[in-house]
């Protein structure tokens, strides 16, 4: 914020490159939670930022919080392919490499990456049983859903 505040007076345009989108996973409201990512993006625009560039946003729809401003989200899967095509010294051990999708939401990205790399793909299946008692205790599992 200090850098933006110091440069906004003399800069014609301010672009912020944010490799990791701050609070990017907090994009859905449940209960009385705040939408921290949307609030942060709106605050940057109010400070005078013209465009925000990020990589692999958890949910690209977060750009809807700043519809009149620039928001570029670059997916790393395309960058992997460009890197592999450009740097011929990179060798992939296709017998020992496998792309894993941690859940259904990442499945399309995992399929794309596995196809580009020419390797197998796998997926985890998560099942939740909220009524289960473990060793006489009721565990609390904090999950990112």
Predicted region positions:
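PRPP-associated nucleotide enzymes
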Residues: 1-145
């Amino acid at each position: 914020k200090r850098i933006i505040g110091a440069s906004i007076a003399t800069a014609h345009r301010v672009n912020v490159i944010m490799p990791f989108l701050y609070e990017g996973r907090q994009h859905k409201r449940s209960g009385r939670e705040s939408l921290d990512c949307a609030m942060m993006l709106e605050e940057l625009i109010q400070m005078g930022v013209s465009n925000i560039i990020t990589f692999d946003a958890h949910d690209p729809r977060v750009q809807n919080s700043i519809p009149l401003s620039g928001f570029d989200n670059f997916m790393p899967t395309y960058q992997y392919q460009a890197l592999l095509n450009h740097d011929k010294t990179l060798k992939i051990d296709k017998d020992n490499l496998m792309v894993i999708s941690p859940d259904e939401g990442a499945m399309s990205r995992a399929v794309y990456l596995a196809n580009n790399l020419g390797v197998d793909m796998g997926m985890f299946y998560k099942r939740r049983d909220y009524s289960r008692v473990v060793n006489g205790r009721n565990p609390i599992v904090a999950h990112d859903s």
